[in-house]
């Protein structure tokens, strides 16, 4: 695994717990806890899912910042576009490239990202944030089928 220091951006932070347990959260560049992400990740405390979700969620949160989108303003179409940008097969304009230099998500990664994002926004809706999106997500699947054309090209 390649490790590099992340400076000036949201990042995943490991937290050492008593008894050798580890938890994972997301922090702002100055080191402050990202409260919304932490509340969601705590639901998965002690599971292997927490670390995986933290890395998928931090990528999405960085994308939200670049797109100047707040949680309360995110629409289903924004999530579909994000999934398309990271490799899912969607039929819409995707906008500027994201994750430049990285391969698109494969089938399993795309499904995990969709599950993470759906869980995150349903959790936000349960707290009263962007309830409309939560209602739409409750009966919808985010696109996770891999765009084979992009997978072959590696873009």
Model regions: which residues?
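N-terminal core-binding DNA-recognition domain of tyrosine recombinases/integrases
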Residues: 36-49, 58-153
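Basic/aromatic DNA-contact patch characteristic of tyrosine site-specific recombinases
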Residues: 1-45, 51-58, 62
